[in-house]
Amino acid sequence: MRDLGYWSAPVLAAALAVVTLAHGASGDDGRARFLATYKELVETNTTLSAGDCTLAAQRMAARLRQAGYPEANVRVFVPEGHPKEGGLLAQLPGSDPQAKAILMLAHVDVVEARREDWTRDPFTLIEEGGYFYGRGTSDMKAQAAVWVDNLVRFREEGFRPRRTIKLALTCGEETNGSLNGAGWLAEHERAAIDAQFAITEGVDGDLDAQGHRIALEVLAAEKVSQNYLLEVTNPGGHSSRPVPDNAIYHLVRAVDRVSHYEFPVQLDEANRAYFSGMSKIVGGQDGAAMAAVVANPADAAAVAVLDKNQNWHAMLRTTCVATTLAAGHATNALPQRARANINCRIFPGVPREAVRDQLVKVVADAAVSVTVPEVRGPVAEPAPLTAAILGPVTTVAHQLWPGVPVVPALEPGASDAQFLNPAGIPTYGITGMFTDPDGGGIHGLNERIRVQSVYEGRTFLYRLVKIYANQ
């Protein structure tokens, strides 16, 4: 997934750069080839219901082989029992065997998309009005295409990095309950992805409503997604003889209590750095509230100001929300069972059981059980913020967008970093792609990303990986 933060009003518009690089300003640097790669990825359906990640991986592997990569350095992997959920491993060997590799990581699976709901065909890459439209254009086939394109460009140039540059394209990031490719690699192919650190999705650059750049974010920590099942069982009976002890009533009251509960504010290195940095950029009441919360997380007035912004609210705490309901077995019978799924995004380092225990207290009804139906991935371990990571990001960002600050961030959602960080591979969300305040339809209808953002992100990530590879 990608960050869905938004900005409710213009922020220091006069002081920040407007998107100015033209669509074709950087000349012919293989852009047509990159666009063909991007198009092929978007137009390869990789939804769980009808798609094929293995096919997408095979197509990207073919591009690398065509660029001259030997079979030993390009491999499509297919986990047993999951023929359409395969992925790609590739590498450009480095010159120093003592230097640990860097890993370019991307998932190629996408959220479901129904043609009848979309204005355009979701599985056709369409350029219109300065945007690329299509499922996965933003989340995250643009970056996946950049990673493949990077390896092609490096090979074409004869670039010999000090560190080995590895690529992993995976499936399953968007499909809860199915196989996760990054998690599978961490468990079954750990050596193949071993790296000093990895770069993947997570957060983008922020634009305000007028298209002014606000900041380039770097993901250093993220929450863990965990579902909890609220369930009530009851003997039921005939609907003509209602009783107060109704499974649906118990469940509705429980869900209502959850909806009104706020978990306490927490700060870690990532969101502390974010609010400290953004307080100077945002200014005004919001900026003052950010600074106040950093100084005192218990400042209720400051927290109330930040909570008006959905993204800031989510960055400050664990959040839980009802996502599905199911109850009853017949329209003329008292319900024998009622269930609700509560999806929680758990603040880094907080145990799952601690959240379950708190939900039990909030529900405060012995008739309602609170269970963990499935554990998907370990608890997030934040990647350390170091000069070796942030320095090159700042250098390249200032080359492309002078004056735009680089700000560490905590992602309210979750990415495949949740599998690599606990496996000992610090993983950072760095895209170099600036996105609109409304999120660009990620996971929703008519997903889009600015054409300019894709091409600028391509340039940014190309330069950044080169710097990292020669550290």
Annotate each language-model stretch with its function.
Residues V42-G51, F132-T137, L216, G237-P242, ...:
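Second-shell loop/turn segments in exported
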Residues M1-V11:
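Bacterial N-terminal signal peptides that target proteins for export
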Residues Q91, P97-A99, V111, D206-L207, ...:
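An extended, acidic, His-containing surface patch that forms the Zn2+-binding/catalytic region
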Residues L35-T46, E231-N234, T371-P378:
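Acidic/histidine-rich, surface-exposed loop or edge segments in extracytoplasmic proteins
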Residues S26-R135, F154-R163, I342:
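Acidic/His- and Gly-rich active-site-bordering loop/insert found
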Residues A9-T20:
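Bacterial N-terminal signal peptides
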Residues Y131-F132, S138-E217:
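Acidic/histidine-rich catalytic neighborhood of metal-dependent amide-processing enzymes
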Residues G183-E187, S240-P264:
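A short core secondary-structure module
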